[in-house]
A protein has these predicted regions:
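The catalytic "switch" region of P-loop NTPases
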Residues: 100-224
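P-loop NTPase nucleotide-binding core
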Residues: 1-149
């Protein structure tokens, strides 16, 4: 997989990462719906423990919503945070109403599977989709959300960096290495919180100064 490309290769990597998202109880991947549902269930359980409200009361529902929106609103200041928060709100409302169809559409959006804004607007009422240009921003949003949902954060594992090494076009290779540099800098500078990134490649695809990772001087100076 590539991290950047002219034909949606970066988005394809994002789709694979989200499709394979795993937890201890769902190690085989496909855990996104489980994570979202458990988050809402945990908020409901916490609300019940903190109050004498009955789960079927309007007051209980309002107390749960207050906690849900506290998490959602805290993401608004991040890049694309408002849109991400809006989708979380749609998911929560669908969960509360037992609307599995809308839940499925929101998960489809989170997975980056809407090809056009028109399609997303028609099905969800939102005029934005995840693209090759901004997919990494949504990874950062997911990591922040996961922290607030009770997890330690997100650990991303990307193997086969040799696929970037094999890209014949030098400019395209450089764009991919630039994306790695962005990730590296973000984690060190605190712009990407609660996220760990492990990338693997052969010694040659890392150390080759002609076309490997070390061919991008800004990376070589940091990693060598």
């Amino acid at each position: 997989r590539r991290l950047q490309g002219t034909k949606g290769q970066g988005l394809a990597t994002y789709k694979e990462l989200i499709r394979n998202i795993s937890t201890k109880t769902r190690p085989e991947g496909g855990a996104l719906t489980l994570i979202l549902d458990r988050w809402i269930n945990a908020v409901q359980t916490e609300t019940a423990a903190e109050s004498d409200l009955t789960p079927d009361s309007l007051e209980f529902e309002k107390a749960v919503e207050k906690k849900i929106y506290a998490v959602i609103n805290s993401l608004n200041e991040m890049v694309h945070g408002f849109d991400f928060s809006r989708l979380l709100t749609l998911y929560y409302r669908a969960f509360a109403e037992g609307d599995d169809e809308t839940k499925g559409k929101v998960v489809k959006w989170f997975r980056g599977e809407y090809a056009t804004k028109t399609e997303a607007k028609s099905e969800l009422g939102v005029n934005i989709i995840i693209t090759d240009e901004d997919w990494y921003e949504y990874i950062k949003l997911f990591s922040a959300f996961l922290k607030m949902a009770g997890y330690s954060g997100m650990l991303i594992l990307i193997d086969e960096l040799v696929n970037i090494y094999k890209i014949p076009n030098s400019i395209t290779r450089q764009y991919n290495y630039e994306k790695i540099l962005t990730m590296y800098n973000d984690t060190l500078q605190g712009k990407a919180k609660y996220i760990g990134i492990i990338m693997c490649g052969t010694p040659q695809c890392i150390e080759d100064t002609r076309r490997g990772v070390y061919s991008y001087e800004a990376l070589r100076s940091r990693l060598a």
